[in-house]
Amino acid sequence: MDNCIFCKIVKGDIPSKKVYEDDLVMAFHDVAPAAPVHVLVIPKEHVLESARAVAAEHAALIGHIYTVIAKLADELGLEGGYRVVTNAGPDAGQTVMHLHFHLLGGKLGPMA
């Protein structure tokens, strides 16, 4: 999608502090972190707009994303635990309509 900020990051049009990339997903540090470690993990293709749109055909992609999240948590020193958050729709706080997962670790603030 031309106006999607995450699609622009994947294409390299917008810089990011990338921590992981493969054929399916990309992970990078959030520009406004809500925790000491705050990484976004996104599918590289804009095929899903939110968690509400996830269908059975996307099960392998979602499984891959969670595998990447676990790998990143280990690499980023989150042995003490971490949170994985996805917001589904504007009322839940989703501001970028491209499926993404927040990996949050370290001392966390409020859940809001």
Regions found by a protein language model. Name each.
Residues 1-112:
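HIT superfamily nucleotide-processing domains
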